[in-house]
Amino acid sequence: MSLSEARFHDLVDATQQALEDLFDESGMDLDMENSAGVLTVKFEGGAQLIFSRQEPLRQLWLADRSGGFHFDYDEESKKWVCEKSEELLGEMLERIVWERAGEKLDFDEI
């Protein structure tokens, strides 16, 4: 069953806030900007992650230099799941942040 528009926006807002909090608490040298529902995380060295919402598809999108990834929310697991690889958003972020910034962060709650 597809997410309602309101539920979708609530989930994306909560996810983006959790990401901001996690990055803020990490002590990493980075810049963040959240504007018009798009969260951009810029790492030292120029790498960046861009999180955006795709309302018509009810998806959370992640752009990274390795590509674009589209995530659907799974109500059963309460997690965002990549539509192609079925990798969880948190798992992918742990890998990407390690590759881009050399930092180990715990994204289990994402």
UniProtKB/Swiss-Prot annotation:
GO terms for molecular function: ferric iron binding; ferrous iron binding. GO terms for biological process: iron-sulfur cluster assembly. Signal peptide: none annotated. GO terms for cellular component: cytosol. The keyword Iron applies. This is Iron-sulfur cluster assembly protein CyaY. It holds the Pfam family Frataxin_Cyay. InterPro entries: CyaY (IPR047584), Frataxin/CyaY (IPR002908), Frataxin/CyaY_sf (IPR036524), Frataxin_CS (IPR020895). It comes from the Bacteria. Keywords: Iron, Metal-binding.
